Amino acid sequence: MKIHLLLAMIGTFVVIIGAQDQEGFISLDCGLPSDESPYDDSFNGLTFTSDSTFIQTGKIDSVDKDLNINLSKQYLTLRYFPEGKRNCYSLDVKRGTTYLIVVSFVYGNYDGLNRDPNFDIHLGPNKWKRIDLDGEKEGTREEIIHKARSNSLDICLVKTGETLPIISAIEIRPLRNNTYVTQSGSLMMSFRVYLSNSDASIRYADDVHDRIWSPFNGSSHTHITTDLNINNSNAYEIPKNILQTAAIPRNASAPLIITWDPLPINAEVYLYMHFAEIQTLEANETRQFDVILRGNFNHSGFSPTKLKVFTLYTEEPMKCGSEGCYLQLVKTPNSTLPPLINAIEAYSVIEFSQLETSLSDVDAIKNIKNTYKLNKITWQGDPCLPQDLSWESIRCTYVDGSTSPTIISLDLSKSGLNGSIPQILQNFTQLQELDLSNNSLTGPVPIFLANMKTLSLINLSGNNLSGSVPQALLDKEKEGLVLKLEGNPDLCKSSFCNTEKKNKFLLPVIASAASLVIVVVVVALFFVFRKKKASPSNLHAPPSMPVSNPGHNSQSESSFTSKKIRFTYSEVQEMTNNFDKALGEGGFGVVYHGFVNVIEQVAVKLLSQSSSQGYKHFKAEVELLMRVHHINLVSLVGYCDEGEHLALIYEYMPNGDLKQHLSGKHGGFVLSWESRLKIVLDAALGLEYLHTGCVPPMVHRDIKTTNILLDQHLQAKLADFGLSRSFPIGNEKNVSTVVAGTPGYLDPEYYQTNWLTEKSDIYSFGIVLLEIISNRPIIQQSREKPHIVEWVSFMITKGDLRSIMDPNLHQDYDIGSVWKAIELAMSCVSLSSARRPNMSRVVNELKECLISETSRIGEGRDMESKGSMEFSRDIYNEVIPQAR
């Protein structure tokens, strides 16, 4: 059954336009001028906006007004692409969320050439489908159900011949993550029908997910209907008016048969069948039937639930082969009534086997692109893939389709770059060659370049850099790093460069002033020996020593210096609008929301006057954040140190902390197992940096879920460094210190001995792992085993994985990934610190957990609702195709 756009454009839609929520919907009218306001579709009430903010290329036009076709407004305009081979839309989505993605194409002879275009459409780096509009006067649409692998979704139009790619509309709808689950791959729609003799298609607002349902009336069927209300509260949320009609065989003794042809022959298909009993049965009446697919019993003795939907679906895909596909509903001997069915969906599997480029590399290169407005025509879509469409000026390393490519060479020479060398460059984890030559970059050469272990060439020549080159970078040059710095007149490779430059001027001045200096010294000594010895009580503490009062002497300078922005208290009041919006409160004080430079959101942590350790922790945190920089550590924007007023200003993290998400206090959104792994991996990378990337290394001392903050893309960053301490390098790996931390997360060995090592952080991180696994309190006195470590150990001895896991996940996870995470967590919380892994090992094992989860062969199915049931695993080793 070919799905024509005509169904969506001229079919009579049964809709109730009103209070339905379009939250999470993306509805783009491709070609709508950017200065036109969003509008509501007259058929269904969906709000469409211009696509102009989601793509920077292409031109817009309108279909030929003389065409004799009736089109909805969003199909009257289009965007076409005369430049570049690949042009991509970049859309914000949530990683791990399942989406229904619909793209529509109406040529409409916009160019007057009467040449129907053909081209490819890609989803990320993978080809989705060949689009051929030959003979498609009314246009065509393609649907796919796809789980987002990152927080950005690229939909790309790829030119393959002489005609230009076009697009008319893009519609994206979030679905529940426990529906349309596959063993692997995404789902292309084959057909979606409801059994009725109606001629009306149904979509939003009747269908809250905006799935389009076409009526289907088989010649051997008849139909029954009801006006009674149907309970549609299962995960698939089938529209009630669809469930109020059903098909039964014309011959009550015959089976109800539905057939369709496979397309292609070996296509793998998932089938979803929705049933509801809509007739009132008498005491002596029963409706019971067997569900048979391709001659195999799939579910025997099935009886639909009265006025309530029940969904049967294939747990594994099927292949129908050349004979075609057929579904039989066969009345059992005990049944007095014929079988019925209300609606059916069939999807074919499409494997998107090529993983996207490394997410950290993608984030970094897109950040650079946006910051410097690098409008290169090839810089669209995935940077490295497909290989023949990779971005100019970069080179990537490729292993195989199951491994994400990484960027190994970046050439931004002669690109008009200005300002300082961007810190985001350190996100390129495998970068070998960096060319920033012949730009207008200013400021010092940053130390982080020396910490990028894979770099073998750095070309900074032809800029306006200044200051001294970091010694660590010069040391790496001696070890083989190619470092090109020529053409920076104010940059020097020696710490004595400023002295050398001024020698010619200073020497004659010093010579002529020597006698004057001698006279001044003699006079000064005379007065010094006459002066009374100063009383110790009149001496101020040296600048390196803080005074005991948090509101330290205003005549004394602050006990630290910072290159970060120092704000006055009045500026802090202004940025927080006089502290009108509190984000939370901790031991340090209240955290407020604010703005710097009008648009940059910040979080302002204001020291409470009652905080006994406040100034000490304040000083420690500023000094630490002044010298550490990592993508997984919260950045310090600035600070305030004015009399009794102390404040820390951080980057704003709009998604709060991990604890809020686990507890459901942040919008009620349940983090998937994949999302949880990515978050703790981010946190682990930040902690690994503190332990191994800092000089000297640092112990955080307060790792917990409330100190793991999430940005708008759910990227995790460690926060709250007030308790952090450095620890020695070399043989002596611990320091004696007063015990500090949070009960429940605190390392028992550290608590007993007062000896602090990086392994104390490992213990706390293990508790965090157990928290994201189980989503249970760290300490719960009502449990037989109150502490979470004891409780999980007890459950492991029972082999009770299901009781350990967060029930909100509904078993939607890879068992191997989960067990590996539990084993890792338990090794982290070993009572002996010597038996705990280091953070590098933790990072590697979390990566393995994540790989196992993202590539799992089979995923768990939601059985929370009794309105759905999967088919038996051992019936099928083949799958379905397409409808006719």
Swiss-Prot record:
Pfam families: LRR_1, Malectin_like, Pkinase. Binds to the ammonium transporter AMT1-1. The modification Phosphotyrosine is found at Y650, Y750. It comes from Arabidopsis thaliana (Mouse-ear cress). One of its GO terms (molecular function) is protein serine/threonine kinase activity. Residues 1-19 form the signal peptide. SMART domains: S_TKc. One of its GO terms (cellular component) is membrane. The lineage of its organism: Eukaryota, Viridiplantae, Streptophyta, Embryophyta, Tracheophyta. The modification Phosphoserine is found at S736. The chain crosses the membrane at residues 509-529. This is Probable leucine-rich repeat receptor-like protein kinase At2g28990. Residues 20-508 are extracellular. Keywords: ATP-binding, Glycoprotein, Kinase, Leucine-rich repeat, Membrane, Nucleotide-binding, Phosphoprotein, Receptor, Repeat, Serine/threonine-protein kinase, Signal, Transferase, Transmembrane, Transmembrane helix.
